[in-house]
């Protein structure tokens, strides 16, 4: 498996996102090709590909953002295809995000994970992420 940074929105990548996103959250509407292009243009979309087939087996989005307190990083939408879970794809994607965060010299790298995603939570703890004693609040515009 290899990890690469997506440089352009292609139909092949869009199809992969449409296949993977429901595995993370079936309620989310997959992006259009133009929206995927916006993600690629403004964030770092990492793509894990199978060595033999070249097919997309996982993705993660690495986000850098500056606030008054400094530069922070975020990991979003880590999605590993069910057919390859437990084979290190998620770990490789998150480690790549961590390496990029180190290179950018962020104050912290944040991510969230639902409690029922037990394997993912174990992975994040094993990689050195610690649970913050805070509440996460979400507001959805109508």
Regions found by a protein language model. Name each.
Residues 2-70, 76, 94-95, 100, ...:
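Acetyl-CoA-dependent GNAT
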Residues 65-67, 83, 116, 142:
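Short coil/turn motifs at secondary-structure junctions
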Residues 80, 86-99, 122, 126:
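Conserved acetyl-CoA-binding loop-helix of GNAT-fold acetyltransferases
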Residues 101-113:
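Conserved GNAT acetyl-CoA-binding A-motif
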């Amino acid at each position: 498996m290899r990890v690469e940074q997506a440089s352009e929105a292609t139909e092949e990548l869009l199809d992969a996102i449409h296949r993977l996103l429901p595995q993370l959250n079936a309620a989310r509407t997959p992006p259009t090709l133009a929206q995927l292009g916006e993600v690629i243009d403004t964030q770092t979309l990492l793509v894990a590909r199978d060595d033999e087939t070249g097919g997309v087996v996982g993705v993660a989005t690495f986000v850098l953002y500056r606030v008054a307190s400094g530069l922070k990083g975020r990991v979003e939408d880590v999605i590993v295809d069910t057919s390859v879970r437990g084979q290190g794809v998620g770990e490789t994607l998150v480690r790549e995000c961590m390496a990029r965060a180190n290179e950018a010299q962020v104050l912290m790298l944040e991510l969230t994970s639902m409690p029922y995603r037990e394997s993912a939570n174990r992975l994040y703890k094993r990689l050195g992420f610690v649970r913050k004693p805070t509440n996460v609040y979400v507001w959805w515009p109508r």
